[in-house]
Amino acid sequence: MSYKFPNYLRYADTHEYVKEENGLFKIGVSEFAIDQLGDIVFVELVEKGTNLQKGETFGTIESVKAVEEVYLPFSGEVISVNEGVIDNPEILQNDPIGDGWLLIIKSESNVLLDELMNSDEYKSKVVPN
């Protein structure tokens, strides 16, 4: 499979992506990681208004192969949860970078996107040369 690694995303070691939008941060899971999971059957996410610390679990993604936790790459408050992926996990599987985002976070701390991998760094980590 050919994966997309858009330049506008930053990636955590645990395969979550971050997209900055108007001072807020959209969080999701990379195409590569979703593909590795296989058929997704269930998604559970924290509630809107939840305050999370860097590295804290914000949900689980269950597939026919495994159950994986997802982690927040920085501290912040959940201001939006994508209910669509909870109601229909296929959205996450079919479009993880688009309609399959998971949370929108407001962060009061200085979010250092430079601490996360850029698309080339992430691609070299997950796709053999």
Swiss-Prot record:
Example GO BP: glycine decarboxylation via glycine cleavage system
A cellular component term, taken from the record's GO annotations: cytosol
Modified residues (N6-lipoyllysine): 65
Positions of the Lipoyl-binding domain: 24-106
Statement: the UniProt record of this protein carries the keyword Metal-binding: no
Record Gene3D superfamilies: 2.40.50.100
Details of cofactor binding: Binds 1 lipoyl cofactor covalently.
Transmembrane segments: none
Cofactor: (R)-lipoate
Protein keywords: Lipoyl
Family the entry assigns: Belongs to the GcvH family.
Subunit structure: The glycine cleavage system is composed of four proteins: P, T, L and H.
Function (record text): The glycine cleavage system catalyzes the degradation of glycine. The H protein shuttles the methylamine group of glycine from the P protein to the T protein.
Protein known as: Glycine cleavage system H protein
Organism: Prochlorococcus marinus subsp. pastoris (strain CCMP1986 / NIES-2087 / MED4)
Encoding gene per record: gcvH
